[in-house]
């Protein structure tokens, strides 16, 4: 995911300050995620959870999702409307998919990440982290498509 981010940053970097800030926030989220999942290199063994890493990831996750929905997507849809009906329609579809993705991630957050982690739910927590990683990868692909639609036209 960091390689994908690097490619997109090189593609659009410097052309739009808002996008640059967004991509930097994505990088911070990915670093926090990798730090958190890297804490348990042996998935079979129970190890102590770094609560600070979990808190950092959760804060970055909520901030990233909120910024996208309440700030960036709206601006991108407005920008798409200035290009063409086709770009606007595709961007609107992407926005709908992103809303569904946010709901999926927040369901994981509410049911697994925000709860206390102990021996009984450690495996479930690790599976939830993996699912969040997959959902983030899907989200980044959707966001990248939206960025390209708006800024290629």
Swiss-Prot record:
<dbReference type="InterPro" id="IPR023785">
    <property type="entry name" value="Sigma70_reg_Rsd"/>
</dbReference>
<keyword id="KW-0963">Cytoplasm</keyword>
<comment type="function">
    <text>Binds RpoD and negatively regulates RpoD-mediated transcription activation by preventing the interaction between the primary sigma factor RpoD with the catalytic core of the RNA polymerase and with promoter DNA. May be involved in replacement of the RNA polymerase sigma subunit from RpoD to RpoS during the transition from exponential growth to the stationary phase.</text>
</comment>
<dbReference type="Pfam" id="PF04353">
    <property type="entry name" value="Rsd_AlgQ"/>
</dbReference>
<keyword id="KW-0805">Transcription regulation</keyword>
<dbReference type="InterPro" id="IPR007448">
    <property type="entry name" value="Sigma70_reg_Rsd_AlgQ"/>
</dbReference>
<comment type="subunit">
    <text>Interacts with RpoD.</text>
</comment>
<comment type="similarity">
    <text>Belongs to the Rsd/AlgQ family.</text>
</comment>
<dbReference type="GO" id="GO:0005737">
    <property type="term" value="C:cytoplasm"/>
</dbReference>
<keyword id="KW-0804">Transcription</keyword>
<protein>
    <recommendedName>
        <fullName>Regulator of sigma D</fullName>
    </recommendedName>
</protein>
<dbReference type="InterPro" id="IPR038309">
    <property type="entry name" value="Rsd/AlgQ_sf"/>
</dbReference>
<dbReference type="GO" id="GO:0006355">
    <property type="term" value="P:regulation of DNA-templated transcription"/>
</dbReference>
